[in-house]
């Protein structure tokens, strides 16, 4: 759960340092930011901090996903990023086939995006316009 909360912690540093929040920069800058934050919060063992920092440093790396925590974090991040990045239907199908491994992740992906991610119900006063 802690990894889910801090996984994007490197975005602001990446934007300042590289002028970009691309995943590879988040993976570079995020772990030290996460470690610094977690050091100020009691209750985490050194092993937990190491694992959280590993996840923060790899959450945009989709090959060799090891551990259910890693898999769930990647899938949850994709569920949001598909919408934010307006991935095409083909891209969503590819991600489902190649990345999503958990039954719950696939069920959520299908429920949220179906066969066409842009046919989602959207209120008339949608803040994004043109949904």
Residue map of PLM features:
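An active-site-proximal "capping" alpha-helix that borders the catalytic cofactor pocket
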Residues: 24-41
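Acidic/histidine metal-binding catalytic segments
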Residues: 2, 41-56, 69
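Generic helix-packing signal
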Residues: 7-8, 34, 38, 80
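Divalent metal-dependent phosphate-bond-processing catalytic cores, especially two-metal-ion Mg2+/Mn2+ enzymes
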Residues: 6, 59-131
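His-Asp-centered metal-binding catalytic motifs of divalent-metal-dependent phosphohydrolases/nucleases
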Residues: 1-19, 30, 53-60, 77
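Amphipathic alpha-helical interaction segments
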Residues: 12-16, 41, 45, 63
């Amino acid at each position: 759960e802690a990894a889910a909360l801090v996984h994007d912690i490197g975005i602001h540093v990446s934007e300042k340092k590289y002028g970009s929040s691309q995943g590879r920069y988040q993976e570079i800058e995020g772990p030290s930011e996460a470690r610094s934050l977690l050091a100020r919060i009691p209750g985490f063992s050194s092993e937990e901090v190491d694992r959280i920092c590993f996840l923060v440093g790899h959450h945009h790396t989709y090959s060799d996903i090891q551990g259910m925590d890693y898999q769930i974090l990647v899938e949850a991040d994709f569920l949001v990023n598909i919408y934010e990045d307006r991935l095409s239907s083909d891209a969503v199908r590819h991600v489902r086939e190649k990345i999503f491994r958990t039954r719950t992740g696939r069920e959520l992906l299908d429920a949220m995006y179906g066969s066409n991610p842009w046919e989602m119900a959207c209120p008339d006063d949608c803040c994004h316009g043109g949904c």
